[in-house]
Design a protein with these regions (language model features):
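Hydrophobic beta-strand residues in large extracellular and virion-surface proteins
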Residues: 15, 19, 42, 57-59, ...
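Oligomerization/assembly interface segments of phage tail-like spikes and tubes
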Residues: 75-95, 153-165
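Acidic-leaning, charged glycine-interspersed low-complexity segments
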Residues: 107-164
Length: 167
């Protein structure tokens, strides 16, 4: 058996796909210091990549804090997956506005897909609906900036969410 995507990766990728689709659908942009509109980018990964372009939404799975049994004697569980969403923008105040937008978009939950490799096009894995993820907000707050912060850390906001799934 070749292990490809597990539930954790499916949840992370489903959230990323959802946000990317919403950005495209709404043609979401933010102004830079010169008043030029910049499209919001959505990236995956815990580590910051210097090749990424601001403004951005960074998404990664943090932990799996809950796995409660659904009923006595059952092996079915209600699992939660804690996800970090870091928002990094070009100008002060934009990070809060973009965080509000993200909260509004994911408030009703997201469809979770089961991804499988596509040998013909590795950049576009096949997907089928795995279930629905309920979203709970754990924290929503600006990340304090420090004096010599680089461009990626000056205007930053962090959302911590739990996505719940039966399984």
């Amino acid at each position: 058996m070749i292990l490809t995507w597990a539930t954790s990766t499916n949840i992370e990728n489903s959230l990323i796909d959802f946000l990317r689709n919403e950005v495209i659908e709404q043609a979401l942009q933010i102004l830079d210091v010169n008043g030029v509109a910049k499209t919001v980018n959505v990236y995956a990964g815990r580590e910051l990549n210097n090749d990424w372009n601001l403004p951005l939404i960074q998404v990664y799975l943090d932990s799996k804090p809950d796995a409660n049994r659904l009923e006595i004697g059952s092996n079915k569980r209600l699992k939660s997956f804690q996800v970090i969403i870091d928002i990094r923008t070009l100008l002060p105040g934009q990070e809060t506005n973009l965080a509000d937008w993200v909260e509004q978009e994911i408030n009703d939950g997201i469809t979770i897909y089961d991804y499988t490799p596509n040998s013909l096009n590795p950049e576009a894995p096949a997907k089928s609906i795995l279930g629905y993820g309920r979203v709970d907000f754990i924290t929503s707050m600006p990340v304090p900036s420090y004096d010599d912060a680089d461009v990626f850390d000056k205007n930053r906001y962090r959302l911590t969410i739990k996505i719940w799934m039966n399984g």
